[in-house]
Structures are given as structure tokens and as C-alpha cells.
């Protein structure tokens, strides 16, 4: 173990992962469809680690305006990668939910593993 730490979270956990990136000194963060994140963009300038966001294009909980606000703010901050998955809904990575999408989940999982390997 090299002592480096990442946070990974889904939905509310995605928001918590984002807040850890901004406030805790983790070395990397992955945030899957973080609900209501647009209400917490004041924390973005505090992010000091690489952060990866996964958003569902058809998300009923995080609309396209919220994703656009995150994209705009993170472009200013410069610490984030943002991936959007077309045709899928909130929870696309959870096999126990009706919104589960195996292709999008596999793609997001692979991207997360590469991101973590590159940043830890």
C-alpha cells in the first residue's frame, strides 16, 4: 500500500465523495450521479485532487441544467473529468435498480478503474 486514498460514492455518496475531495485531503475522488451537487458548487474551488464525475443523460434527479452548471464550474477549477452516459437514468450502475444499464455501468466502471490507477 502506498498510503494514498480515494473516495468513491453513488448518489448521496457521490455528493459525499465530492465534499471529501473539497475538504478532506483525499488523493482522488469518483462521484457517480451526485444528487443536488449543483447546490454545493461553492465547494468546488477547494478541490485539490483529481475528481471524476459520472452523470446519466436521462437522470430524473439531476437535470441537464445541473450537469451544465457542474461542467462550467469544474472547467474553472480544472481538477475534474466529467463523463455523461446517453440514454440512461439515475442509478444506471446499480444492478438492483430498474435503471441498471450493463453497458453504461461497465464503461463507467472501466473509466473509474483507469482514473484511479492513473491518480493513486
Each language-model region and where it sits:
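N-terminal cap/leader regions of alpha/beta-hydrolase-fold enzymes
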Residues: 1-120
Amino acid at each position: 500500500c502506498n498510503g494514498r486514498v480515494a473516495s468513491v460514492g453513488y448518489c448521496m455518496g457521490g455528493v459525499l465523495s465530492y465534499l471529501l475531495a473539497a475538504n478532506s485531503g483525499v488523493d482522488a475522488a469518483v462521484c457517480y450521479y451526485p444528487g443536488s451537487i449543483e447546490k454545493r458548487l461553492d465547494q468546488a474551488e477547494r478541490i485539490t485532487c483529481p475528481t471524476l464525475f459520472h452523470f446519466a443523460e436521462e437522470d430524473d434527479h439531476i437535470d441537464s441544467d445541473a450537469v451544465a452548471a457542474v461542467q462550467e464550474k469544474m472547467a474553472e477549477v480544472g481538477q475534474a473529468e466529467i463523463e455523461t452516459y446517453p440514454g440512461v437514468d439515475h442509478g444506471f450502475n446499480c444492478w438492483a435498480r430498474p435503471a441498471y444499464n450493463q453497458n453504461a455501468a461497465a464503461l463507467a466502471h472501466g473509466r473509474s478503474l483507469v482514473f484511479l490507477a492513473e491518480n493513486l
